[in-house]
Design a protein with these regions (language model features):
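Electropositive polyanion-binding surfaces
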Residues: 1-182
Length: 182
């Protein structure tokens, strides 16, 4: 938070939080460079009254603190997975395999309706190709539908005792030992 009053109130920890923010941004940039697909889509938040009856649906925005924690969690999950892989001991990985080529071809056909042209057939694709599509439609009216259809073209992540990497994160090693933020 760049609010002067807030920074002054927490002046003892502000330098540490500034360093954490800088490190988090470096980790985000590193993941982007290697091709991570970022599905940072606003989520729906259902508001309920005292009786538990829904009264409204609002967009839930992710804050900087949540992004910072997520960045460190991803780094921790990757580091632990790589460590155990190198130890060659039994371990459970969170794997996300490359999308099936037929699903990707369908997605590529779909996005051509929005004027996007993708080179290739969907065989042996790198995550950065999909990342570039995300970047092209960022802020456009069709961003939500294209991101949703891209997500649906992917395989589901799962747990496995064999390290198969994580396609969406463009990570060679990944596990899931941290708890969800939400």
């Amino acid at each position: 938070d760049q609010n002067a009053e807030t920074r002054n109130k927490y002046s003892e920890v502000t330098p540490m939080l500034d360093l954490a923010q800088d490190l988090s941004q470096r980790l985000i940039n590193m993941r982007r460079r290697r091709g991570e697909i970022d599905f940072d889509i606003d989520e729906a938040k259902v508001l309920v009254n005292e009786e538990g009856i829904p009264t409204d649906v609002q967009l839930r925005k992710r804050g900087e603190g949540e992004r910072l924690i997520e960045s460190f969690m991803l780094a921790a999950n990757e580091t632990i997975a790589e460590h155990f892989d190198r130890l060659e001991v039994p371990f459970i990985y969170r794997v996300h395999e490359q999308p099936k080529s037929e699903r990707l071809r369908q997605f590529f056909d779909f996005v051509t309706n929005f004027g996007l042209m993708i080179k290739g057939t969907g065989e042996d694709i790198h995550p950065s190709t999909l990342q570039k599509i995300q970047q092209e439609v960022e802020g456009q009216p069709e961003q939500m539908v294209i991101s949703t259809m891209m997500l649906r073209s992917m395989q589901q992540a799962r747990y496995d005792d064999v390290n198969l990497g994580h396609f969406g994160l463009s990570a060679e090693y990944y596990t899931h030992f941290t708890s969800p933020i939400r």
